[in-house]
Amino acid sequence: MTDIKSLNYDELVTYMAGLGEKKFRAGQLYQWMHEKLADSFDECTNLSNALRQKLKETSEYVCLEPVRVQHSKLDGTEKYLFRLSDGNYVESVLMKYHHGNSVCISSQVGCRMGCRFCASTLNGKVRDLRPSEMLDQIYRIQKITGERVSNVVVMGSGEPMDNYDNLIKFIELLNDERGLNISQRNITVSSCGIVPKLKELADLKLQITLAISLHAPNDELRKTMMPIANKYSIEEIMDVCRYYIECTGRRISFEYSLVKGVNDSMECAKQLIELVKGMNCHINLIPVNPIKERDYKQTGKEEVYAFKNKLEKNGINVTIRREMGRDIDGACGQLRNKYMEDIDESDGGY
């Protein structure tokens, strides 16, 4: 079965021609899928019943099923848990800002990177998400809320560079003027630092924002937090980041989760300053989300601001990430893990 929502426009034209259909039919279907956000072929009312039946028999129409929604009473953040067609689950977050709505999506079911501060790695990677499954997280949220999504962050469960080909196809579809037409500059992709794939991404010269999950200013400390550091050194990561900036002209963002007593010292701040000085970059400080299965604790507010001030005084562009959805299991993987626990406790019932 063809995953029809993962086809770009030209591929869909070819596919429809194989069914004996003219090009304009492909345009109609593409509009239903990516602009009108139809839930199924049945909603494509300007396609004949015979064509809709033919499509049902030859292709799969991905439409994620929301099984749990949490609403933050603190800031209006909404967290969605979606069931996939194979029974797996992924989660997404809608964050509301004055400049528009931003959706954080997952790129994989689970994750194999093993970062110690992240809940999505607790049970490892199950599988990659297809372009359609990444897109439909955004489509479902926009359709459920009736509010336009203006920004997309690929920073949920999974490592996007570990699902590279599907990620690039997803960006192409999301950016297509025939669909949601979300500007590349409004798309942020996070990575823990798979260097060869980051180089490939740089060579594409896309105008997306790249966010590197750094979290430590030296290899020794980073290895205790992120297993990927055993494969790629910070020096290699910084080199590919400079290459990315050179190729794209885009500023790099470095994510730095502050963990109490681990990476929040003034010495760490000094090392971080030396690491990024002179780069066209931005540091995003993140008070780590406490996870019951991990022993990491959040740095105190006073220490967070001391760390920030140290960077600012040395000319580093830095912000503290606003904590969103703190009362609704807002960190990556927490809602999925809790839901799976609930299913286990109820012996498989929903």
From Swiss-Prot:
InterPro entries: Aldolase_TIM, Elp3/MiaA/NifB-like_rSAM, Methyltransferase_A, RlmN_N, RNA_MTrfase_RlmN, rRNA_lsu_MTrfase_RlmN/Cfr, rSAM
EC number per UniProt: 2.1.1.192
GO biological process, alphabetically ordered: rRNA base methylation; tRNA methylation
Cofactor: [4Fe-4S] cluster
Pfam families on file: Radical_SAM (PF04055), RlmN_N (PF21016)
Location, primary (coarse class): cytoplasm
Cofactor remark from the record: Binds 1 [4Fe-4S] cluster. The cluster is coordinated with 3 cysteines and an exchangeable S-adenosyl-L-methionine.
CDD domains per record: Radical_SAM
Annotated [4Fe-4S] cluster binding sites: 111, 115, 118
The keyword Methyltransferase belongs to this UniProt entry's keyword annotation: yes
Residues annotated to bind S-adenosyl-L-methionine: 158-159, 190, 213-215, 289
Other known facts: Reaction proceeds by a ping-pong mechanism involving intermediate methylation of a conserved cysteine residue.
UniProt function note: Specifically methylates position 2 of adenine 2503 in 23S rRNA and position 2 of adenine 37 in tRNAs.
Protein name: Probable dual-specificity RNA methyltransferase RlmN
Native source species: Lachnospira eligens (strain ATCC 27750 / DSM 3376 / VPI C15-48 / C15-B4) (Eubacterium eligens)
Gene assigned in the entry: rlmN
